[in-house]
Amino acid sequence: MKIVVIGGTGLIGSKLIANLTAQGHEAVPAAPNTGVNTLTGEGLADVLTGASVVVDVSNSPSFEDEAVLNFFETSTGNLLAAEEKAGVGHHVALSIVGAERPPARGYFTAKIAQETLIEKSPIPYSIVHATQFFEFTRAIADEATADGKVRMAPVFYQPMAGDDVAEQVARVATGSPVNGRVEIAGPDRYRMDDFFREALTAWNDPREVVTDPNAHYFGAPLEEHSLVPLSEATLGKYHYNTWPGRLQSPK
């Protein structure tokens, strides 16, 4: 069947396209560099023609609170309207574990706004909540660095590989709509400070990881279970300590 992947040229999108194509589906990447812009609506009608499923793994180019909210509200609204006209039967969106829980965080608030639009749409849907990706480990460490030290809260942390994310999103996309949320996570649960201490040691990174209960995650405070599933989740197969990309230098 024809499955359109919004954000299909990015980290998860490209893996998802490969996964779906290997299963024999017509997987079509849709992104600004393929002529599809969900913010303006450009190219949506054409790319959605004949599509059975749409998977949205797109992301905002800006993480400033107002900009990211505008991105998800506008792009999701345009996408859902175009899907309804095209007769799409299943909308799948990738979101974040813990997005709906306090404390409120700008990016998470924007993702919940996106989910609310999806839930109110007449199109059958599935929302996949994923934990943080292995591929973002260096970026998260860099964002948490001040004065040469990486400050991390000792909260629970259960990241997963992008390949596992793509595999699970593909599974959901090729199944029946759940009209609700599905949670996915990595196979191992850590304390966040311990995870990053081990990661930086493996990189021979000289930065000290400081355990700081008041450390923020991209500007927002964390509670012990903010970043992990609270109930049953489908677990990935890749362990970080044996993941092939663990020691790769950032591009």
Regions found by a protein language model. Name each.
Residues 1-23:
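N-terminal Rossmann NAD(P)H-binding glycine-rich loop of SDR-like oxidoreductase domains
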Residues 6, 69-73, 103-112, 155-163, ...:
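Short-chain dehydrogenase/reductase
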Residues 22-86, 96-106:
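NAD(P)H-binding glycine-rich loop region in Rossmannoid oxidoreductase-like domains
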Residues 54, 165-169, 184, 192-195, ...:
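Non-catalytic, hydrophobic alpha-helical segments
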Residues 87-90, 95, 116-136:
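Conserved beta-loop-beta element that borders a ligand/cofactor-binding pocket
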Residues 125-126, 139-160, 164, 183:
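A conserved pocket-lining segment of Rossmann-fold NAD(P)-dependent short-chain dehydrogenase/reductase
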Residues 135-141, 146-147, 172-182, 205-207:
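Glycine/proline-rich active-site loop of Rossmann-fold NAD(P)-dependent oxidoreductases
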Residues 196-251:
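Mobile cap/lid helix-loop segments that border enzyme active or cofactor-binding sites
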